[in-house]
């Protein structure tokens, strides 16, 4: 059996990590060991925060809808309940956009929801 020299494989692996670490400060972008640790940490944080972003935006939308609904004299929870009764299927993102960009349309939606039985 012939001997396999791993120089090329190791170099490629290290270059890949150092390429991912480009832009990091100090030794985190120069030395393989610290760069590897930082890349692993960065990828772990990115994975976690892709999921967290969805939660954060949902919280933001709910806060905006609640603020706009209270200006119309209704709480967020009452508004969502009334929207379900009125069979209005507007998601939270769209409601928040309406509340911010078109308050008149949002108040119409609230009025329609308030009259629902």
Curated annotation (Swiss-Prot):
Tell me which GO cellular component terms the UniProt record holds.
Answer: cytosolic large ribosomal subunit
Q: Which InterPro entries match?
A: Ribosomal_bL20, RIBOSOMAL_L20_CS, Ribosomal_protein_bL20_C
Q: Which Gene3D superfamilies match?
A: 6.10.160.10, Ribosomal protein L20
Identify the gene encoding this protein: rplT
Name of the protein described by the UniProt record: Large ribosomal subunit protein bL20
Q: Which organism is it from?
A: Synechocystis sp. (strain ATCC 27184 / PCC 6803 / Kazusa)
Q: Which GO terms describe its biological process?
A: ribosomal large subunit assembly; translation
Tell me which CDD domains the record gives.
Answer: Ribosomal_L20
- Any Pfam family the entry gives: Ribosomal_L20
The entry assigns this protein to a family as follows: Belongs to the bacterial ribosomal protein bL20 family.
Q: Which domain of life is it from?
A: Bacteria
Function of this protein?
A: Binds directly to 23S ribosomal RNA and is necessary for the in vitro assembly process of the 50S ribosomal subunit. It is not involved in the protein synthesizing functions of that subunit.
Could you cite one Gene Ontology molecular function of this protein? Answer: structural constituent of ribosome
Q: Which UniProt keywords are given for this protein, alphabetically ordered?
A: Ribonucleoprotein, Ribosomal protein, RNA-binding, rRNA-binding
């Amino acid at each position: 059996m012939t001997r396999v020299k791993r120089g090329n494989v190791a170099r490629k692996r290290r270059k890949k990590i150092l390429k991912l670490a480009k832009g990091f400060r100090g030794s985190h972008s120069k030395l393989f060991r610290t760069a590897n640790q930082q890349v692993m940490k960065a990828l772990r944080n990115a994975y976690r925060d892709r999921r967290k972003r969805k939660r954060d935006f949902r919280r933001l939308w709910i806060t905006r809808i609640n603020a706009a609904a209270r200006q119309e004299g209704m709480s967020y929870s009452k508004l969502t309940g009334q929207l379900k009764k009125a069979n209005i299927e507007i998601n939270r993102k769209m409601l928040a956009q309406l509340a911010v960009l078109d308050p008149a349309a949002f108040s119409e939606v609230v009025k329609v929801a308030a009259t629902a039985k």
